[in-house]
Structures are given as structure tokens and as C-alpha cells.
């Protein structure tokens, strides 16, 4: 297999894009299916972005997985249409392999119209139908996890000046309400655990002055002091150090050869 054929096998064609869709947004979306090397939206002779893109994955196995997971997801109200790239060995299998479309509610599984795609990234509204619907299969949970992950990543981007997060129209209330987080009970649990831990430490003759939990070490600094060495800080440092990049090897694997970025205290 030649290099060109191998690259075609690792590439997807993504069509029916809304004009506001960017390479950055597609990168974040398709990265949920596997490591992405680059995303390219071609331009016409006038310099305007065309309504399709090519997504090149690092691993060939990510291609059919992304096709199955993301085909038909709406970006800014328009469902994307994913196809194998011309020349790909997967294209010959496309006619014989049926990739199931994902539907919600009472939609007919045989419907192929764009309106049948209910999995959305843009313009999510907290309707009663969305909030009350039940997830009937592990695939539904997986798709919801993809949407939540993209929402979190684009929220980080919007927090630091990217215009894409606000335009997407995400609503946290569109996430499934079957799993609720009780903040008061969690806070009480942490207080009880901390109290128990202090009792154990005070009873040990060698740990009284040396070992403290993270909560104890930073509680003395007052409520305005925040622990900065969290994974979110590492995520932000990695994602925003040099701005947006479509090079997976330089952007995603750089931390493997070295150590975690040091915390800025």
C-alpha cells in the first residue's frame, strides 16, 4: 500500500458544513473518535471557505469509528454528512456495510432525511423532551459523552477569547438529568473525611508535622487561594500555549517526552 493510499484510508470527507464551522471546531469534534493529525477546509478562488472538509486521523481504525459515531451530528443546525475519502479502501466497503444512524424518541429508524438527525452540537435547547428522554443503550451514553466533552473543550476556548463556544449555543441543562450532583452532601462528605483524616494523623507520632492532605495544605491560605496544579490547568497550558494547531504529533505528544508542566504558584 502506497503512502497516498494509506493517507486516504485515514481520512474522512465531511460535507454539508455550515459557513460558521471552523477547522478548530471540527478538530475538537473528531478528536473524540481518535487522535487527529489535521483538519482542512478548502477555499474557493475568492478565498471563502467551502462547505466541506477533510479530517486526517493518526490511526486508520478511527475512520470507521468516527463515521459511525459522528455522522449526522448538527453543527449550527445543519447535519454534517461524513463519507470515506475517494480512493480509500473503506469506500468499497461502504456499499456493503450499513452504518446505523442514531435516532431519538419516536423517529423511524428507516428515515434518512436531514431532519431525522437529532444529535446536535449547535443550538441545543433545554426542552422537556431532551431533559426527560431516557438513554436506551450504551451508544446513547457514549454520544452524550462526546457532546459533553466537546462542550467542555469549547467552553475552555471561549473562556479565553475564542468566539466559537458562545456561537454554538450549548446549554448545560441539555445534559441528561438522570445523574445529579448533590453539592451539599458532597461538601458534608469531604468535611467528614477530612475530620477523620486529621484524627488519624494526630494519633500517629511521625505524621503530625510532615504529611497533610491537599485540602489541609491550602486551607490555611484562606478562601481566596486556589490550587493551581489541577488537571484543568495542565489542559489549558497544553491547549493554549502556542494557539490552535492542527499538528497532533507536536501538540498532543509533546508532554510524553518531558514532564508535566510545572504549577505556577
Swiss-Prot record:
Keyword field contains Acetylation: yes
Residue stretches making up the RRM domain: 10-87
Post-translational modification: Phosphorylated at Ser-136 by MAPK14/p38-alpha-activated MAPKAPK2/MK2; this phosphorylation is stress-dependent; this phosphorylation decreases its RNA-binding capacity therefore affecting RNA nuclear exosome-mediated degradation. This phosphorylation mediates YWHAE and YWHAZ interactions.
Compositionally skewed regions (Polar residues) per UniProt: 107-125, 170-196
Residues where N-acetylglycine is found: 2
Disordered as annotated region, ranges: 91-125, 166-224, 237-265
Domain-related comment: The RRM domain mediates RNA binding; the RNA must have four nucleotides for efficient binding. Mediates the interaction of NEXT complex with promoter upstream transcripts (PROMPTs) and potentially aberrant forms of other non coding RNAs, such as snRNAs. The RRM domain exhibits specificity for polyuridine sequences.
Protein name: RNA-binding protein 7
Source organism of this protein record: Mus musculus
Highest classification ranks of the organism: Eukaryota, Metazoa, Chordata, Craniata, Vertebrata
Gene: Rbm7
